[in-house]
């Protein structure tokens, strides 16, 4: 089984985590922000896949090791490229920046393990070639000594970290997949299935209705996800288990007051989790109305 995971921020303090396969939404989970505890709560309700594609959301790798330890992770190569682009910009002004930008961009066209090996070699050689340039230092406004080309170093490290974690080219290795599974001609290297499908449509809906309250935005997320599940109930049946604006508002207020809570909707399989101090203590449970 191949799965995709992603998170959508409904507001600055509310995020909905979504997990889907090639056709349907399999689960979603509402949290204040992406963290390993929230990811675990979502993943525990879903059968472990052979491979999961992620954009690198905070806490996901930690949750993956705990809940789906045998699943292979494919880091979305497009997001890996975008992370480099944020540091270099789309028009780098230095030779080192231009070269690193092109190396990152070439991630999007790698089709086999040979090309992947050549790409890794290019990344290593880039660091060697520009070693002197990258080692230049400067002092900031406080007089602290720091790398002059710190943004380039961060960009390179973001790629090198993914290489060490062995999560960039999982899509090129079919040895761990069940022969009965069918994903077409190629395994996915990006999260486009969920980013360009489920999430893109949901983001568009939320963007077109910016004036909606947080309670309504949460309900929109729930409705949208639910209607993309394999066998959704009728609208009248959904209304019987749909959380009300009042119940969402009450719970969201408790979150903002830094209450430690974890609620759930058994019928929907969704919940809200608020966990800031990263302790293992149990917390009180608040159910929806």
Regions found by a protein language model. Name each.
Residues 1-70:
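RNase H-like nuclease fold core
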Residues 9, 58, 82, 198-199:
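Short hydrophobic/aromatic residue motifs in ordered secondary structure
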Residues 14, 63, 87, 203-204:
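Short, function-defining helix-loop hinge/capping sites that tune catalysis or transport
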Residues 54, 61, 102-289:
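Acidic/histidine-rich catalytic cores and adjacent linkers
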Residues 55-104:
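Conserved beta-strand -> loop -> alpha-helix junction used to position metal-binding or nucleic-acid-contacting
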């Amino acid at each position: 089984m191949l799965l995709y995971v992603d998170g959508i921020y409904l507001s600055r303090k509310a995020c909905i985590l979504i997990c889907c396969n090639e056709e349907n939404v399999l689960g979603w989970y509402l949290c204040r922000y992406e963290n390993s505890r929230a990811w675990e709560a979502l993943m525990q309700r879903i059968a472990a896949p052979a491979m999961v594609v992620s954009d690198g959301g905070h806490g996901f790798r930690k949750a993956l090791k705990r809940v789906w330890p045998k699943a292979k992770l494919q880091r979305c190569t497009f997001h890996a490229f975008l992370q480099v682009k944020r540091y270099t910009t789309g028009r780098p002004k230095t030779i080192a920046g231009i070269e690193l930008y092109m190396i990152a961009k070439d991630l999007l066209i790698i089709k086999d393990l040979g090309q992947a090996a050549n790409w890794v070699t290019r990344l290593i050689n880039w660091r060697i070639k520009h070693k002197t340039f990258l080692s230049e230092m400067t002092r900031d406004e406080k007089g602290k000594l720091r790398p002059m080309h710190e943004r380039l170093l961060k960009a390179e490290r973001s790629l090198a970290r993914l290489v060490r974690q062995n999560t960039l080219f999982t899509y090129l290795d079919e040895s761990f997949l069940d022969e009965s599974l069918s994903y077409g001609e190629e395994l996915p290297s990006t999260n486009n299935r969920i980013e360009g499908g489920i999430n893109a449509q949901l983001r568009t809906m939320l963007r077109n209705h910016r004036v909606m309250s947080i309670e309504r935005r949460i309900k929109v997320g729930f409705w949208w996800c639910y209607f993309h599940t394999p066998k959704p109930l009728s609208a009248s049946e959904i209304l019987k288990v749909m959380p009300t604006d009042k119940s969402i508002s009450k719970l969201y207020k408790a979150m903002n007051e830094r209450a430690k809570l974890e609620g759930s909707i058994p019928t929907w399989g969704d919940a809200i989790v608020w966990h800031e101090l990263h302790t293992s203590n149990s917390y009180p449970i608040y159910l929806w109305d």
